[in-house]
Design a protein with these regions (language model features):
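Sec-dependent signal peptide recognition
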Residues: 2-8
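C-terminal motif of bacterial Sec signal peptides marking the signal peptidase cleavage site
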Residues: 14-17
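Bacterial signal peptide processing site
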Residues: 19-22
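N-terminal helix-cap/turn-to-beta initiation motif at the start of protein domains
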Residues: 27-44
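N-terminal glycine/threonine-rich, aromatic-flanked beta-hairpin/loop signature
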Residues: 53-101
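Edge beta-strand at a domain terminus
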Residues: 84-95, 130-150
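Ser/Thr- and Asn-enriched, surface-exposed coil loops between beta-strands
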Residues: 94-96, 121-127
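An anionic, turn-rich surface loop/hairpin at beta-sheet edges
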Residues: 96-119
Length: 150
């Protein structure tokens, strides 16, 4: 038993020192109503189609409630650690069959998002998006206090 506790302590310290502890809520965490107020804030993409992002890859969203805009900081399409910053607007609607839908566009005539997403789950600290046109395409976000790449 002592060895197990020591091993768990070592793993925890290693994970914290690597900055990869991902806070997840219990499955019975209360669901929130999907609205601009409840999704506003800073979020980190932690899972893409059920898999964690590769080491060094990041996507952060800063969602603003008042004017329904967002800023995305990401390096998924970059060979450097310099964030690619994208801005735009988002829109929320409700589909009778699918539920809450989020869609958006990019500023500077860069077009619309590739998908519209069902916000399948929203708690105080987690949000799960599933593409309306491909239910196997999912993105899991966790709320963060600070976006470290701003």
């Amino acid at each position: 038993m002592k060895k197990i506790l020591i091993l768990l302590s070592i793993i925890t310290v290693a994970a914290v020192s690597c900055g990869k502890i991902i806070q997840t809520e219990p499955e019975d965490a209360p669901q929130l109503e999907v609205n601009a107020n409840n999704i506003s804030g800073q979020w980190e993409l932690v899972e893409w189609n059920g898999s964690y992002l590769s080491e060094g890859t990041y996507v952060y969203l800063d969602i603003v409630r008042n004017d329904k805009t967002y800023t995305m900081y990401q390096n998924m399409d970059s060979f450097t650690n310099v964030p690619h910053v994208l801005t735009g607007s988002y829109y929320l609607s409700t589909d009778v069959e699918l539920g809450a839908i989020i869609r958006g566009n990019y500023d500077h005539d860069s077009g619309e998002w590739s998908h519209r997403y069902i916000i399948q789950s929203l708690t105080a600290n987690e949000m799960l998006w599933v593409a309306t046109d491909d239910f196997s395409f999912s993105q899991k976000f966790v709320r963060v206090d600070v976006i470290p790449v701003k």
